[in-house]
Amino acid sequence: IARKAAEEHAKGNPFQIGMFTGASTGDKLDGELARANAIKFRTPYQSNKDLRAALNAHQAQYFDLHLSELAQSLRYGFLGKIDVAIVEAADVTEDGEIVPTSGVGILPTICRMADRIIVELNCRHPKEIRGMHDIYEPADPPLRREIPIYTPSDRIGNDCVKVDPAKIVGVVRTDEPNEGGKFSPLDDVTMAIGKNVADFLVSEIKAGRLPKEFVPLQSGVGNVANAVLGCMGANESIPAFNVYTEVIQDAVIELMKQGRVKFASGCSLSVSNEVIREIYANLDFFKDKILLRPQEISNNPEVARRLGLIAINTALEADIFGNINSTHVSGTRMMNGIGGSGDFTRSAMLSIFTTPSTAKEGKTVSYTHLRAHETLRHL
């Protein structure tokens, strides 16, 4: 698509696409298309520097919304029709059963709504991953009922996405690894943040404000989140716990091997390629400990409130009134987007935001008397 856009632009012809994704993607998608000026519209979340530059230069339209709301907004018709769904699969059958790979995102909704489906059959993900997914779409109003998840391990749907096989217009075989981003090494600052959070949670247990059995944890992405998870796992005063989150990252898998994480429910395995290979090589161990759901379910505020989550996410900036800016640098330039942090924070039993005290090599302060931009009012 990027090459086609470049060719058409060289001829003086317009060529751009609108794009819906689950959340952020790798450079081969967001980066390539942004550099080719091939994106007209993008939602809901991104983390690519070239796409970010295009958005802030107003070269592409961007809709920043809570991840849990995207699938239903598509079904409601708020965002227009879907012409083509391009989906990655570990397996696809002749009768239209698509087995997702390491992420689900908005897969069931776009497959049902798209006029045509192109399946990228990636042999890096074994067919045996089938059974690690729980595919469920809620009914739309006025027929919607509760989402019947009462523990993170509850299964409520199918192990694959079922589509009309006539809509599948192509199957492309690939052998591509995930574009897993490397996080910065843990340092004294991130480890101190992790220890502070772990110590705080222990104090809440001792004070009786958290049950001694503990509650499920939701954690954002990044080296601070990894440090928090590591410190929680190392603190013996915190019992082994479940995870109900959007992205499952390396630290969760390591704690699972140690017996400190009992079960993890999420939308995607956002782990390094070394860890994804380890998971696939030991599916007998991991398959009954990991469940991947559509983000409409993994991030659903109803479920977060019912489970009583501890939500731990990252902020760009916070002020002394409890307001959080997690989207706009200096209040004006879009960073990545709200992502899933608002889904969880607004409904968690206990919500925590973490960030180092300073950024940009100490040139900017993360905690202010009044934030430059308000993403969430966190009181």
Annotate the PLM regions.
Residues 1-374:
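Conserved alpha/beta enzyme-core scaffold
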Residues 376-379:
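N-terminal low-complexity segments that are often proline-rich with Ser/Thr-Pro
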